[in-house]
Amino acid sequence: VCSSDLKFSADLADYGVWKDSLVTAGKTQEAGTSAGGYVAFPAGTEMMELRIGSSFISFEQAGENLAKEIQKTASFGQTVKKVRTAWNRSLSKIKLKGGTEDDRVVFYTAFFHTLQYPREFSEYGRYYSPFDGKVHEGVSYNAYSLWDTFRAEHPWLQLVASERVDDMITSLVQMYEEGGWIPKWPNPTYTNIMIGTHADAVIADAYVNGFRNYDVEQAYKAIQIGRAHV
């Protein structure tokens, strides 16, 4: 379950939550698969800013994440500038020569898409594992669409995001340790809707290209489990 901490820059005229068909005014927290919240602003409110922190660990962690990622005094414009700077830093790793403007738009759009997933799932040194329902110390990545990405995206990430590759392999090994086998498409837990064991190719390709900063023996065991049971 994902928790969210919301901070509004404008006063609220009304607020509350709902769960299933029950609406409770004045309440600020609710949990469930069919739950949510609502707010209303005073008449005449034309503009406001909303800051959101999210966490798979806890509501308290969501607040901590928000405090670390968006300063209280940061405006929307300042936050946009900070994010744009971060993306420009990543996308500037490759410089194109030649081609048309349309060609460059296509390339950098695709480049941007490749850096979306797998996504970092850990929260400042800890992560919630949907495979065993526990909070662990360490790094975690999730949302691997492996039968789509094992051929090209993961080898590509070895070139443009090499600092993340070992942690991505570590995350696959952790999924095996916490759930029993490496999933075909963790999103965020087992989905069981893809064929094959394409994580094997991702791990093997990383290994032969020199990425070894993970538990290699455990990775091999995980591959063997997949080979024997899928």
Kindly give the residue locations of the regions a language model identified:
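Short, small-residue-biased leader/transition segments that mark boundaries at the very start
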Residues: 1-3
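Function-dense linear segments that define catalytic or interfacial modules
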Residues: 19-146
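Short, solvent-exposed loop/turn and secondary-structure capping segments
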Residues: 61-63, 120-126, 155-158, 166-169, ...
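Extracytoplasmic/secreted proteins, especially bacterial periplasmic and envelope-associated proteins
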Residues: 78, 82, 86, 102-109, ...
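Inter-helical turn/loop segments and adjacent helix faces that build the functional surface
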Residues: 94-98, 159, 210-214
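Secondary-structure capping and boundary motifs in well-ordered enzyme cores
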Residues: 102-103, 139-148, 161, 191-199
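Alpha-helical support elements that line or immediately flank enzyme active sites
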Residues: 109-122, 142-165, 204-210
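Helix-terminus loop motifs that line ligand-binding clefts
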Residues: 128, 163-209, 213-216, 221-227
